[in-house]
Amino acid sequence: MVKVGVIGLQGDVSEHIEAAQRALENLGVSGEVIWLKKPEQLEGISAIIIPGGESTTISRLMQKNGLLEPVRKLGEEGLPIMGTCAGLIMLSKEVIGATPEQRFLELLDVKVNRNAYGRQVDSFEAPVKLAFSDEPFPGVFIRAPRIVELLSDKVKPIAWLGDRVVGVEQDNLIGLEFHPELTEDTRVHEYFLRKAL
């Protein structure tokens, strides 16, 4: 049975839990999706989602709750991890605009710029092209970080807004600027969860 953990310290956790549950149903896979708050819950985990929210807060709480190092180790060992918006920041190797106390997982070979699109008023929705589907995906961008550079050949673009890369994949990792959980469309979650099957 697949066990998916959504890091539930801050951010849009319940939406990700619902999206992952729907995606598992669509894939015909039995599994559970849990609200992941402490290291003990990582036992038997099949995949992890790091949701959007505020990256400074998520970073601080992951350190405080003892999740940062165990999650990094699991990512290095090949466990599927998807980060959306602030979760992308948490996965990234380099972060422009990070505060000195922020710690990141540094698993994904990308450089991102925090809050590159500006404040809440600059949030928008636009069709995103996916590498694994012909139909456009409804991309919801909320104070999104921006992928400014791919730092190695291991990183493959999987989502584009116009000609700009807004989603990447590196082996077991997926990082997205946008919020797939804020739509009824589960294609991105299904694509990610196939890594755990």
From Swiss-Prot:
Species the sequence originates in: Thermococcus gammatolerans (strain DSM 15229 / JCM 11827 / EJ3)
Assembly, per entry: In the presence of PdxS, forms a dodecamer of heterodimers. Only shows activity in the heterodimer.
Catalytic activity: aldehydo-D-ribose 5-phosphate + D-glyceraldehyde 3-phosphate + L-glutamine = pyridoxal 5'-phosphate + L-glutamate + phosphate + 3 H2O + H(+); L-glutamine + H2O = L-glutamate + NH4(+)
Protein's GO biological process: glutamine catabolic process; pyridoxal phosphate biosynthetic process; pyridoxine metabolic process
Keyword Membrane: no
Coiled coil (residue ranges): none
Keywords (A to Z) from UniProt: Glutamine amidotransferase, Hydrolase, Lyase, Pyridoxal phosphate
Name by which UniProt lists this protein: Pyridoxal 5'-phosphate synthase subunit PdxT
A GO-annotated cellular component: glutaminase complex
Hydrolase listed as a keyword: yes
One Pfam family here: SNO
Enzyme Commission identifier(s): 4.3.3.6, 3.5.1.2
Residues involved in L-glutamine binding: 53-55, 114, 142-143
This protein's pathway: Cofactor biosynthesis; pyridoxal 5'-phosphate biosynthesis
Name of the gene: pdxT
Alphabetized GO MF terms: glutaminase activity; pyridoxal 5'-phosphate synthase (glutamine hydrolysing) activity
Active-site residues from the entry: 85, 179, 181
Function: Catalyzes the hydrolysis of glutamine to glutamate and ammonia as part of the biosynthesis of pyridoxal 5'-phosphate. The resulting ammonia molecule is channeled to the active site of PdxS.
Family: Belongs to the glutaminase PdxT/SNO family.
Database matches in PROSITE patterns: PDXT_SNO_1 (PS01236), PDXT_SNO_2 (PS51130)
CDD domains in the record: GATase1_PB
